[in-house]
Amino acid sequence: MFAQQPRSAPAPFYEKVKQAISEKIHSGVWRPHDRIPSEAELVAQFGFSRMTINRALRELTDEGLLVRLQGVGTFVAEPKGQSALFEVRSIAAEIVARHHQHRCEVLLLEETRADHIQATALSVPEGTRIFHSLMVHYENEVPVQIEDRCVNAAVVPDYLHQDYTATTPHDYLSLIAPLTEGEHIVEAVQATAEECALLHIHAHDPCLLIRRRTWSTTHIVSHARLLFPGSRYRLQGRFGS
């Protein structure tokens, strides 16, 4: 008489949903940036509870297969882009190199007086006349970076007069004040409520922050605060002797 083999436990319902969605993505039925059915439609399709469907979508988002945009829907994620950590490149150039479309939305472009933090970043006296810009960069209409930049007005006097929907601050600054030195500080941060809204992410979604300072000869040209959603971007650097 043979011993009866124990039966393996059936997969949880949310795992079945995850597997079905993953198969559609990996087989190419659903391609990057395709909008997938809504939670209500998936509930009707699978016959599972909304809580089960929500868990499946949440885990697939955490795994990088889906992107959920509040008030818009859930989309198939693009494979994560890479940003050069040690090489200073334009975000537009990185996106175009992946054969994707770049778009920039300019939120703020102003002349102001440097506060303590800005003055320290640019190594100028507090109250010095500077330029300040704030913009969001999109890759195939998905927000991938908030660029918050302050610029030394004495070094780049025409900064405010450029069309940054046609060129990037990086490209313009590289032309006017060629880069001779750069500094990167990278950290994991939690975005503010305003930043979450701009990036279409949830309150506790992880983000990567690069604080970048660039020099031309002996002058600090600009200090940029570059915020990336962690689920849509990764940094890659290479160095050697």
Curated annotation (Swiss-Prot):
HTH gntR-type domain span: 11-79
Disulfides per UniProt: none
GO biological process: L-histidine catabolic process to glutamate and formamide; L-histidine catabolic process to glutamate and formate; negative regulation of DNA-templated transcription
DNA-binding residues (ranges): 39-58
Gene3D superfamilies registered for this protein in UniProt: Chorismate lyase-like, Winged helix-like DNA-binding domain superfamily/Winged helix DNA-binding domain
Entry keyword set: DNA-binding, Histidine metabolism, Repressor, Transcription, Transcription regulation
SUPFAM superfamilies attached to this UniProt entry: Chorismate lyase-like (SSF64288), Winged helix' DNA-binding domain (SSF46785)
Pathway(s) the chain acts in: Amino-acid degradation; L-histidine degradation into L-glutamate [regulation]
CDD domains: WHTH_GntR
Domain of life: Bacteria
Role played: Repressor which binds to the hutP region in the histidine utilization (hut) operon. It blocks the expression of all the hut genes in the absence of inducer.
Protein name: Histidine utilization repressor
Organism this protein belongs to: Klebsiella aerogenes
